[in-house]
Amino acid sequence: MKYNFDEIINRANTNSKKWNPDIYKATYNGHNDLLPLWVADMDFRVAQPILDSMSKIIEHGVLGYTGVDEEYYQAIINWNKKRKNSHIEKEWVVFTNGVVPAISFMVQTFTQKGDNILIQTPVYHPFRMTTENNERNIVTNPLINNEGVYTIDFEDFERKIVDNNVKIFILCNPHNPVGRVWTKEELIKMGDICLKHNVLIISDEIHSDLIFKEHKHCSFLTLDKKYFSNLIVCTAPSKTFNLAGVQTSLIIIPNENLRKAYQKTLGNVRIETPNSFGIAAIKSGYTEGEEWLDQVIEYLDNNRNFIEEFLKENLPEAKYVKPEGTYLAWIYLGDVLKDREIEKFFEEEAKVAIDYGHWFGEEGRGYIRLNFACPKSILEEALNRILNSLK
């Protein structure tokens, strides 16, 4: 089946956090007339097999309590083996209703108030928020920024762990917002340091199905089993198949002791199984959604390249390195905007809703994160709004 990702679907009159003006205006100083390219979901219609599986539930007419069966687990296991070359066991899979709440429960389970947690800035800001909201402390290992290409400062990484008695390291792979897909060698270096100092690795791999053709994602689950003693991997069909509203995520915990401790925390708040639509989405997405996903990645690749071409031709002062994974463009506009206030420029002049770089840490100041998982016509309009507002 050929999918049409140029189709514009009106999401403004839904409860879309991204598109509903009455919702997003709280984030953008009351402005409700912006073109949204911020929240990390796609503006594409979901794969037809997933929609069909959900329609069957509605047609059946009963929405009772749910449980999961063998088909559910096999869909997850087979997908991970085929797409990611990772072997997981049925028993390792733990359900939560989202990666961010899942990480919050991990912080509560495996640390005490006042403990230190390491992140690599600029990074997805809920990592900081959920840590600090749980009364733990953030320690940063800033990524090295070489003209928009980011690498890891391993000496600083280990020094920060030792000096601060770090308990948890939250890794983002692929990295949001900078778009790096960490290599096997980079993961091994971080893994060995964490193993040496008994640091729990939480690897957020929610974007791991969205990798561009010249790169390959390497999960911690594909590495030496020695890392499994202190490893939790967070995945979900939400980014892969545009299902954030279904609120279903999959937490992979190979170590039995870690898994039991975590399940106890979840059991205390009665987080047990996905909802009816989450189960259907996982089964149908992971067994019949591959064709849709491959077409999405191809479309995203074209959008990724279009941004590069547009900026080179019209805004050469902007700094943009194409992401290796994710559908998020990380663009430096400090030399373009100069002394202009970035919020005022986007909200009052360009009228485009993006994520401001400083939301991801001070290292992101002057940057924007732009979501290009949208029809090309919308992306082109947003870029032209930015360009025309600079004239």
List the predicted regions and their residue ranges:
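A structural alpha-helix within SAM-dependent methyltransferase catalytic domains
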Residues: 55, 158-161, 191, 195, ...
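N-terminal small-domain helix-loop-helix segment of the aminotransferase-like
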Residues: 2-98, 105, 285
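Conserved core segment of the aminotransferase class I/II
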Residues: 52-53, 225-301, 309-310
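Conserved core of the PLP fold type I
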Residues: 63-192, 209-210, 217-225, 232
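PLP-dependent enzyme catalytic core of the Aspartate aminotransferase-like
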Residues: 336, 345-354, 360-391
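Conserved glycine-rich beta-strand-loop-beta hairpin in the small C-terminal domain of fold type I
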Residues: 283, 299-308, 320-333
